[in-house]
Regions:
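Basic- and hydrophobic-enriched, low-structure N-terminal and domain-boundary segments
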Residues: 2-145, 149-152, 195, 204-205, ...
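P-loop NTPase motor domains
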Residues: 4-7, 11-23, 27-36, 124, ...
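Conserved ATP-driven motor cores of ASCE-family P-loop NTPases powering translocation/secretion/packaging/pilus
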Residues: 416-516
Length: 556
């Protein structure tokens, strides 16, 4: 019996199709005739009013006739479509459920200027896309996705501005070091001789002034960079804070009372590894010091006021965070200063911080120190009203590759929120959004909110893809449904709904040569990634692949 009802249903729908289709077609024809008649009537009135020549004999009559006739057809067809629900042509769904969309060709053309940082290449025209705004930038891309060849090196080769770049493998210095010399001075800080190129050094204590009222703040900033607070380890917070206080006091003492050649972090490490009785003597000397407005004496009193057990834990924490200073390579790299970070604002200067990936965990505090020092120096220089030196037109660029290796650094977080107007642009580069959230928690949004450009490619984890999908937004899309009831004409309806402009799985399936760019205040851009070794704009700016570089010395 079920098959009988199925057959009858099919026969009914077929009969309705055969009967209803001519009716709908006739309805459409009648509607078109009526609309055309109204158009002709309007045309006739125009001819009668404006012309004394018989209808159709003047050429301009026809220039009036056809537009009116076509307009009548369009009106009639549209009305018929609305009444029947049958879609005749592309119908715009509106934006009631979302207005997200991709950037148009005209909107992308705004980024094809000759100035600014390179962010990609237009898919249609092949022209370079640049960002010339003052805001910071942020890149999310997994390892081996092309961050170096597509983001870091292209900008190092062409950006005529001061640059500080974290260079984990030394490849950026090898490839772009010579090219940067045409802009200005180049300093490569390479404690482990990865690049085989002449290495510079920087002493974080070198610019501290014992007579400055800012000595306490400067020492605290260095201590903050030395002590890494692992995310989620609340139990370590007290010991780390006390270790910072002790380190700040020891740094101030070294600056105020040591000879010039001993005003280094190596001396601070030497203090921390003294035998207990000698360290006690050092603390007593600090108590007698009147330098730094009494801050040195206060630091000693604070430590001596602790119980033996608490003091031992604080001492252990301070020693742990300065263990990297036992390396002769790091000692040599921090023994003198070949430049000042404030020069980044006044002279075209390039600084490469080279640390091999296999040493990032052990020596990341060295990177933290230098980045924190650079940010503080630039901020101080910008605030110094007495300086007469002219500032460079373009802001200094901080390309912070392997950003997560720095750990949570308050100086960077403050810079993302406050220092865009100080002649500084930060460009943190991370593997995924999880890295940023692990380090900064809810305050990770500070980085996203202050990024004028968000660049993403090669996304292969669902959480980052989901976050991107939500951030890109939703579009309003339309769809048509048909329903059939026995004995009734088919019913067609047009509906609208919301859809992610790009779903997480679509983001994860993007071609490896393509990237997403979200520029502040603009629709999302789909662009091609750059490849310095294959793109003609970079020809002749870097050494050929077979160029022989000096091998790093085992003694450096």
């Amino acid at each position: 019996m079920q098959y009988v009802f199925t057959a009858l249903g099919l026969l009914s729908r077929l009969s309705l199709f055969v009967v209803v289709t001519p009716i709908l077609a006739g309805w459409f024809f009648v509607w078109m005739v009526i609309a055309t008649a109204f158009a002709w009537f309007a045309w006739l009135i125009v001819i009668i009013i404006l012309s004394d020549v018989p209808m159709g004999e003047a050429l301009w009559h026809w220039f009036v006739f056809w537009p009116m006739t076509i307009t009548g057809w369009i009106i009639g067809a549209s009305d018929w479509s609305n009444r029947t629900g049958i879609k005749l042509w592309g119908r715009k769904p509106g934006d009631s459920h979302g207005s997200a969309r991709f950037a148009t060709r005209k909107e992308r053309a705004a980024f094809e200027g000759s100035d600014g940082l390179l962010i990609g290449r237009d898919l249609d025209t092949g022209k370079l896309l640049r960002y010339d705004g003052p805001a910071h930038l942020l890149t999310l891309a997994p390892t081996r996705a092309g961050k170096g060849v597509g983001t870091v090196i292209p900008n190092l080769l062409l950006a005529e501005r001061s640059v500080l770049v974290i260079d984990p493998k030394g490849e950026n210095a090898k490839i772009a070091g010579e090219a940067r010399k045409r802009f200005g001075a180049v300093h490569i800080l390479d404690p482990f001789g990865v690049t085989g190129m002449p290495a510079s050094a920087y002493n974080p204590l070198g610019r501290l002034d014992a007579e400055s009222p800012d000595l306490g703040e400067d020492a605290a900033s260095l201590a903050e960079a030395l002590v890494m607070d692992p995310p989620g380890q609340v139990s370590e917070a007290h010991w780390n804070e006390e270790a910072k206080a002790l380190l700040a006091g020891l740094i101030m003492f070294a600056v105020a009372h040591e000879d010039a050649d001993r005003k280094t972090l190596a001396t601070v490490r030497e203090y921390l590894t003294l035998p207990p009785e000698k360290f006690r003597t050092l603390l007593e000397l600090m108590q007698d010091s009147i330098a730094a407005g009494g801050l040195i004496a206060r630091a000693a009193n604070r430590f001596l006021g602790k119980s033996d057990r608490e003091a031992a834990s604080v001492m252990s924490s301070a020693q742990r965070h300065t263990h990297f200073l036992d390396s002769p390579r790091i000692v040599a790299a921090t023994a003198r200063s070949d430049f000042q970070f404030s020069a980044l604002r006044h002279e075209l200067t390039s600084i490469f911080l080279v640390l091999p990936p296999n040493r990032l965990d052990a020596y990341s505090r060295w990177l933290r120190l230098l980045v924190a020092q650079a940010l503080q120096d630039i901020a101080r220089d910008a605030e110094a009203s007495q300086t007469g030196a002219a500032r460079l037109k373009q802001p200094a660029l901080f390309l912070l590759d392997e950003f997560a290796a720095l750990g949570r650094l308050e100086a960077v977080e403050r810079a993302m929120g406050l220092m865009a107007g100080y002649g500084l642009q930060l460009w943190p580069i991370l593997q995924d959004m999880s890295q940023l959230k692990d380090l900064y928690g809810a305050r990770a949004n500070t980085f996203v909110a202050n990024a004028g450009v968000l660049q993403t490619f090669g996304v292969n984890d669902f959480e980052t893809a989901k976050w991107l999908s939500q951030m890109i937004g939703r579009e309003t899309t339309g769809y048509q449904t048909e329903s059939h009831k026995p004995g009734d004409a088919p019913s067609t309806s047009y509906n609208v709904t919301a859809r992610d402009l790009m779903t997480p799985d679509e983001i994860m399936q993007i071609d490896p040569s393509v990237q997403l760019l979200r520029v502040q205040g603009k629709p999302v851009i789909i662009a091609r990634k750059l490849r310095y070794f294959a793109d003609r704009e970079f020809d002749g700016l870097y050494p050929p692949p077979d160029a022989k570089l000096a091998k790093p010395s085992s003694e450096r």
